[in-house]
Amino acid sequence: MSWDQVWIDVNVASMDPSVSAPYGAIIDAALAVKDGKIAWVGPRGELPEFDVMSTPLYRGKGGWITPGLIDAHTHLVFAGNRANEFEKRLQGASYEEIARSGGGIISTVKACREASEAELFELGRKRLNALAKEGVTTVEIKSGYGLDTATELKLLRVARELGKHHHVDVKTTFLGAHAIPPEYKDDVEGYVDLVINEMLPAVIAEDLADAVDVFCENIAFNIEQTERVLTAAKDAGLDIKLHAEQLSNLGGSTMAAKLGAKSVDHIEYLDEDGVVALSKSGTCATLLPGAFYFLRETQMPPIDLLRKHKVPMVLASDYNPGSSPLCSSLLMLNMGCTLFRLTPEEALAGMTRNAAKALGVEDKVGVLAAGMQADFCLWDISTPAELAYSYGVGVCLEVVKDGHLVHQ
């Protein structure tokens, strides 16, 4: 066999559902890479013969290899911060009260409208580096802090440029319907028209988005407005997803599922009818414990119902300046378990296999199997559960992206 690299003295948490062991685990494993893809993975004793003299051999010292982590919901391209609102919330103001008073998303919109693409790129690069150091190899980045055509395009251009200049794969999502801008506060339908008839065609013309998202909530867009935007996006050939049931149950998840959404996100107030709709459509449920924690929410997502109806659960950081300024995927693994009572295996699946499904890239990443992209991490852990159990001790030893060692 002729391979580009071989890894031995490792255990592999493949996350491959066809492997019956928890985590898809292979103890005392070997993994071979060829042309940026996994060429072989399995028990070391079954490793085919290869040219030891000409093949780089990496020894994992008994550590664990997992798929590269996937953060499937972020807003990491933005300017400014909202530390002042953090203080207000601690003094008793709610997220909704701050938003209605012109704070929240709108304050970040002002900063983003004023920032240059170069400034936004540098800010985004630093945040992407932080995620990459924790083993993230694929990330989704949303717009939504422009709320006018020029700034929405600017944010998406920056996200695309980050993907071109960083080893982390970037999937972009157009979230023009994130909030109602001040200039349209008395004409929400007019703003929805702008999103559909001006912003969306401009985004498509520059090939700036892989998907379209909407914030469906009482303080944002109602069901009818949301459906208009998602239908237009679907008709244009883009994937669709939705912020839904975060603060109340408007039925957005059921509507999005009927349209074939890749995921619905937040879903603290999702009911069983909505869960059943997700199950029937194959739509993923994206859990965002960072926002739940930071906003000090008490309504938990319906984890038991999602399990009962076998809805794929995704775990993501929701990194953003207002409700989850927590740029750490490993922290989300811990929070997913401690706050939402996920098992460590469910949490890891939520940042690998299921996250890939939510982004429509499950044929490329998310599990370690022959033919998949060689995106994986070596961890200094004795069991995969440690990734969720412990935090902050620097257990990510090495990251391989497309067969290239990018972090050591």
From Swiss-Prot:
Pfam families: Amidohydro_1. The keyword Zinc applies. Its main location: cytoplasm. Fe(3+) binds at H73, H75, H243, D318. It is found in: Cytoplasm. GO terms for molecular function: imidazolonepropionase activity; iron ion binding; zinc ion binding. It is an enzyme of class 3 (hydrolase). Belongs to the metallo-dependent hydrolases superfamily. HutI family. CDD domains: Imidazolone-5PH. One of its GO terms (biological process) is L-histidine catabolic process to glutamate and formamide. InterPro entries: Amidohydro-rel (IPR006680), HutI (IPR005920), Metal-dep_hydrolase_composite (IPR011059), Metal_Hydrolase (IPR032466). This is Imidazolonepropionase. It catalyses: 4-imidazolone-5-propanoate + H2O = N-formimidoyl-L-glutamate. Zn(2+) binds at H73, H75, H243, D318. Its cofactor is Zn(2+); Fe(3+). 4-imidazolone-5-propanoate binds at R82, Y145, H178, Q246, S323. Its EC number is 3.5.2.7. PANTHER family: IMIDAZOLONEPROPIONASE (PTHR42752), IMIDAZOLONEPROPIONASE-RELATED (PTHR42752:SF1). It comes from the Bacteria. HAMAP family: HutI. Keywords: Cytoplasm, Histidine metabolism, Hydrolase, Iron, Metal-binding, Zinc. N-formimidoyl-L-glutamate binds at Y145, N320, G322. GO terms for cellular component: cytoplasm.
